[in-house]
A protein has these predicted regions:
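Extended, non-catalytic subsegments within catalytic or DNA/protein-binding/adaptor domains
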Residues: 1-246
Length: 246
C-alpha cells in the first residue's frame, strides 16, 4: 500500500470530528466588554482598550489573527469613510486562501450605530473602539503596524500577542461563557463571527468574500457553528445580532 493510500485509509477509519457548538458565548463576551475595566473607554488602560479593539475588529471582520497582525497605519491604509472604516493590510500580506494574483485585501467595517437606534449599543461598535485606539496610540507608535504592545517600547505586536489579546477578551466573560470542557482559542472568533452572520441574513457568498475562504464549502464544512439566530453586510450581522440577545 502506498503512503497516500495508507493515509486515506486511516482518514476514512477515523474521520475528523467537528464541534457543532461554539466553545464560548459571543453575547456573554460582548456583555463583559461593555463593563469596567473596558468601559468607559476614557478611563480604560491601554491594555484593556487594545484587548477590546482587537476582539471587536476580529469579530466584525471575520479575519484571522494574521490579517490583524498585518494591519497598517501607513498613509492610505486606514480610511475613515462616511459609512465606516476601510482597513488595508500591509501589501506583503496574502490571506491564507488567496493567491499572489488575487486583488488586494480590503477589510470594511461598518459602525454599529448605523444599524441600531439604541445609544447604549455604541459600546460594541468596532469603529468607535478602533478610532479611540488609533488616537490613543498614534504618539507611541514608531512604525506602521496598527497593533502595538501596551508597554514601552510599544513595539509592533506579534501574531501570538494578538491571539492572547483575543483569548483575554473571551476570558473576561468568566467561566460561564465557556462551553463545558472547552478552552478558548483566538481562531474561534472566525467561526463564531461568520456563523452569527450567516444565521442573521448574510449569504454564504458574502461571507466567503469577506473572510477570504477558498470556497463556501470550507465555511460550511469546517467553520459553521450551531448558534441561535437573534434578528435579521457582515460586520453588522455578526455584532448587532449577538448584542441583541442581551
Amino acid at each position: 500500500m502506498t503512503l497516500g493510500k495508507l493515509i486515506r485509509a486511516l482518514f476514512l477509519q477515523r474521520p475528523p470530528t467537528r464541534k457543532l457548538l461554539p466553545s464560548w458565548s459571543l453575547p456573554k463576551v460582548l456583555e463583559a466588554l461593555a463593563k469596567p475595566p473596558f468601559e468607559p473607554l476614557a478611563e480604560a488602560s491601554l491594555r484593556d482598550i487594545t484587548i477590546k479593539t482587537v476582539f471587536l475588529v476580529a469579530i466584525a471582520s471575520g479575519q484571522r489573527h494574521s490579517a490583524l497582525h498585518a494591519l497598517s497605519v501607513a498613509p492610505g491604509h486606514i480610511r475613515w469613510e462616511l459609512g465606516g472604516v476601510r482597513l488595508i493590510p500591509n501589501p506583503s500580506y496574502i490571506a491564507k486562501n488567496q493567491t499572489s494574483s488575487s486583488s488586494l485585501v480590503e477589510i470594511f467595517i461598518q459602525p454599529l450605530s448605523a444599524h441600531s437606534s439604541i445609544g447604549a449599543d455604541k459600546v460594541w461598535c468596532p469603529v468607535r473602539a478602533l478610532k479611540y485606539y488609533w488616537h490613543r496610540t498614534k504618539d507611541k507608535r514608531s512604525g506602521n503596524q496598527l497593533f502595538i504592545i501596551t508597554k514601552e517600547p510599544f513595539s509592533p505586536a506579534s501574531r501570538d500577542t494578538i491571539s492572547k489579546w483575543i483569548v483575554a477578551a473571551i476570558q473576561a466573560a468568566g467561566p460561564e461563557a465557556l462551553a463545558p470542557g472547552n478552552v478558548p482559542r483566538a481562531h474561534d472568533t472566525r467561526s463564531v463571527a461568520t456563523s452569527w452572520a450567516l444565521f442573521n441574513g448574510v449569504s454564504v457568498e458574502e461571507i466567503h468574500k469577506a473572510a477570504y475562504w477558498r470556497s463556501p464549502n470550507s465555511f460550511i464544512s469546517f467553520y459553521l457553528k450551531d448558534v441561535p439566530a437573534a434578528e435579521p453586510s457582515f460586520s453588522r450581522a455578526a455584532l448587532s445580532a449577538a448584542a441583541g440577545t442581551h
